[in-house]
Amino acid sequence: MADITQQMNNLSVEQGSQGNGSSRSQYVPPHLRNRPSGGNGSFGGNRRGGFNNNSFGGFDNNRRGGYNNNSFGGYNNNRRGGFNNARGSGRYNTPKPGVGRWVDGKHEPAEKNERLEKELYGIDEEPTTQSSGINFDNYDDIPVEASGEGVPEPITAFTAPPLDPLLVENVKLSRFTKPTPVQKYSVPIVAAGRDLMACAQTGSGKTGGFLFPVLSESYMNGPAEVPETAGAFSSHKVYPTALVMAPTRELVSQIFDEAKKFAYRSWVRPSVVYGGADIGGQIRNLERGCDLLVATPGRLKDLLERGRVSLASIKYLVLDEADRMLDMGFEPQIRHIVQECDMPGVEDRQTLMFSATFPKEIQFLARDFLKEYIFLSVGRVGSTSENITQKILYVEDEEKKSVLLDLLSANDNGLTIIFTETKRMADNLADFLYDQGFPATAIHGDRSQYEREKALAAFKTGTAPILVATAVAARGLDIPNVSHIVNYDLPSDIDDYVHRIGRTGRAGNIGIATAFFNRNNKNIVKGLVDLLTEANQEIPDFLNKIARESAFGGKSMRGGSSRGGRGGATRDFRKQGGSYGGGASSSNWGGSSSSGGGWGSSNNGGYSGYSGRSNGSSSYGNPSASNSWW
């Protein structure tokens, strides 16, 4: 890593290209399969047909609607229906490899299966396996602020109790050695029956922060009862106990993959649904078993309207990357799912919201969906990790390709993600790198789900160690061993920059982030300088000069506060004098806050309406100190 940094420090725009394509493996990305090879690779096949082999984790090249990743551990059982047989003995009575049962109020874990364990957890030293990084212990020094009444004491290790013994075993198999700060607090908070709104820096273990406690409590308490009012067609409908909503197909697939690891040998069967893939195949997968459902809002709304999913048994609702979902316009679907369908009300479920940033608008949303929640802020939320070495290079647009080749030639190890602003540039840049002998692939919104999954599989396994991506991969994706991020095109929003470079330096590992900056990026210069200062990074002279020029011009160059400014993204809104029905005390935990009254006219432009469920039940935002099902 020191060698890479040294070579980067010596870079200049005048240096020539050092492609050295002859020394690299000849890989042909999916979108170039129809091009004549020209001596640059031996792979053939159809341009849009994916890889001509079946080596990528069981992907089926003959399916255009995405691979069958709902079959737990790769097993494709043919179980149909029968979801209502959980009311007494034996939920999912037919034993399956790696799948336990809930029988007569007791959890019966399945026997261990070596083949499944190898498939789920991989082998040490494999490129797809990431262990705790060398700086993981530094997380112990990250400040944590928890506000709310009666915050439970954090845990210090993965032990049983408070966690279920089976979950502890699965966590060890996944090579997690100690909880991150967000996990230390989320486990006891969920165990205490409390709602949670958590902010944590990118790469700090937010996925485990909700999967660990939700699965652990599910193992100990069992599935929810299916409503007795289920109709004649209920055998075709699934009744999950937990629902996780996230904004993108890639993120829900990633959460599902993690859920499979931690649900191994348990009664809980994870499933995933998302748009862009064959809905018929997803329905068939749901019918094989669904206790924990991971979904994008649009596809879930579709399945609810088709009568294939019921939320009547939901105990746990998780909203991951909530700010991103609002940015993408999912708020109407989310409100419909939570407030207008058959999901239990706010008093009868536990709700957890996780994200790297929580501006005021998201905290407003929390007043409808959460009750007497605990607000958890871990580290510099909305900032960058000091595990990431940030380098800002001044590069004019016409010189970017040459400088990029120098960077890639200097960094022969690890995985590299290159971010562009447009889909066309992503394709063009991937083609250019391929022609220069660099095995690259690309993902963006115009690629089919099948092509995106193939590209990510090739990237994760190191077959194509360079991924050119638009913002579709910027949020939430947790790809092991990404050592270098290149912002070929800087975003116009500084928060997008934060999330992009957060793809490296994850779980305590060290990474490098390089950005190509020129005067076309003046709109984010102030925010960029602030971020570099916060993370104790070197600020180049040209950046300070342009920042001073921008400030002298009298214009705000904050660049990145699309949701009302980053300053409010780390603080509990209840402590800022918002329109809650009560103030917060000055105790260490921020005091308690009464959230009564729903939305009022003093919301400063906040949402109006949506104060209650359409079926006439009590309005959201009215707190209760108890959970009826705990």
UniProtKB/Swiss-Prot annotation:
Q: Which residues form the Helicase C-terminal domain?
A: 387-547
Q: Name one GO molecular function term.
A: ATP binding
Binding locations of ATP: A200, Q201, T202, G203, S204, G205, K206, T207
Pfam families, alphabetically? DEAD, Helicase_C
Q: What is its EC number?
A: 3.6.4.13
Instruction: Locate the compositionally biased regions of type Polar residues.
Output: 1-14
Query: What keyword terms does UniProt attach to this protein?
Result: ATP-binding, Cytoplasm, Helicase, Hydrolase, Initiation factor, Nucleotide-binding, Protein biosynthesis, RNA-binding
Give the motif span (Q motif). Answer: 156-184
The record places domain Helicase ATP-binding at 187-376
The catalysed reaction is: ATP + H2O = ADP + phosphate + H(+)
Stretches of the chain forming a coiled coil according to its record: none
Q: Which portions of the sequence form the region Disordered? A: 1-49, 78-111, 554-630
If you read the UniProt record, what top EC class would you report for this enzyme, in one word?
A: hydrolase
Please state which protein family the record places this protein in: Belongs to the DEAD box helicase family. DDX3/DED1 subfamily.
Q: What does this protein do?
A: ATP-binding RNA helicase involved in translation initiation. Remodels RNA in response to ADP and ATP concentrations by facilitating disruption, but also formation of RNA duplexes.
**Protein name according to UniProt:** ATP-dependent RNA helicase DED1
Organism field: Debaryomyces hansenii (strain ATCC 36239 / CBS 767 / BCRC 21394 / JCM 1990 / NBRC 0083 / IGC 2968) (Yeast)
